[in-house]
Amino acid sequence: MKNSESIKEFKKLNSSQITEKIDQLRKDLFDLRFKQATRQLNETHKFKIIKKQVAQLLTLSKSQSTSQKPAD
């Protein structure tokens, strides 16, 4: 399955861009849920795609933050 943005493209982002992208995707999820509740949503497959992208970005963010911290 080819998503609009792949993990390779996400790896090019810095931490602030990742945070902005996560916020945008979470807003998109909220909008999808609202459309679903009002029976206006025809593209239910987008839930899975967006949730997967959020998970990928959170994983990438966590790995970047742990690699930047010095070992104690």
Curated annotation (Swiss-Prot):
Keywords tagged on the record: Ribonucleoprotein, Ribosomal protein
One GO term describing the cellular component: cytosolic large ribosomal subunit
Single GO molecular function: structural constituent of ribosome
A GO BP entry: translation
Similarity comment: Belongs to the universal ribosomal protein uL29 family.
PANTHER family given in the database record: 60S RIBOSOMAL PROTEIN L35/50S RIBOSOMAL PROTEIN L29, LARGE RIBOSOMAL SUBUNIT PROTEIN UL29C
Protein name listed in UniProt: Large ribosomal subunit protein uL29
Organism in which the protein naturally occurs: Prochlorococcus marinus subsp. pastoris (strain CCMP1986 / NIES-2087 / MED4)
